[in-house]
Amino acid sequence: MALAYDPLFITSDKSLSAFDVASSPPQPMNLTQDELKRIAAYKAVEFVESGMVLGLGTGSTAKHAVDRIGELLRQGKLENIVGIPTSKKTQEQALSLGIPLSDLDAHPVIDLSIDGADEVDPFLNLVKGRGGSLLREKMIEGASKKFVVIVDDSKMVKHIGGSKLALPVEIVPFCWKFTAEKLRSLLEGYGCEANLRLGEKGKAFVTDNGNYIVDMHVEEDMGDLGAVSDAILRLPGVVEHGMFLDMASTVIIAGELGVKIKNKH
């Protein structure tokens, strides 16, 4: 069932002191994390218009957005939508909902992508890919005119790596230990640990592209993220990393006090 949210609780980054459009302080809505994710996702789908080519994200938050798009198509409120899925899982979901699908070869420019994130810093830089789909996500969202990110407020951090959770790096399987050690050594100054991601039965997790993922855990602020990004990508064996720098157009943040919208300036 669709969740309602009070428009008085929606703010923009013109005033980041939060929820100052309400005449009195809003009361906490006491919602679960999944309900907050759904609220953010439904708000993001308001950006969708008939005739658009859409990048369809992957993960627990993006799933709600894909569900909503399918619902609006069934209701006839959206028409002539084409979806570009960022993973096999999202592809299966979209097909089950009757969303027409295509790919970047047929649609190299995407009107709008909607996806979740694992971290969002004050400059709207992101960590993504803890679900394992970072390469396709970055290809599709990087080809988008507008990229809307949907999160609950637990994903907001002071700096990338601030959650102490993983920064994923996709690598080729060949001599993965060699590549993982190079990554660890590269970020050693930030207190880095590098661990191969494991999947079922303790075997290496394999991405949709047939690659492995090394999860990087850093203890300190990495500072110049652009320089760190370049250094990671220069390592032979690295395919892509999960830092999405200067890519988000808008971030929609759902919390117990309502929904907040931040736009890239």
Swiss-Prot record:
- Catalytic reactions on record: aldehydo-D-ribose 5-phosphate = D-ribulose 5-phosphate
Keyword Phosphoprotein set for record:
yes
Source organism superkingdom = Eukaryota
GO cellular component terms, semicolon-separated:
cytoplasm
List of residues that carry N-acetylalanine: A2
Q: What class of enzyme is it?
A: isomerase
Q: So what EC number does this one have?
A: 5.3.1.6
The record's family statement is:
Belongs to the ribose 5-phosphate isomerase family.
Q: What's the stated role of this polypeptide?
A: Catalyzes the reversible conversion of ribose-5-phosphate to ribulose 5-phosphate.
Record protein name field: Probable ribose-5-phosphate isomerase 2
Identify the taxonomic lineage of the organism of origin.
Answer: Eukaryota, Viridiplantae, Streptophyta, Embryophyta, Tracheophyta
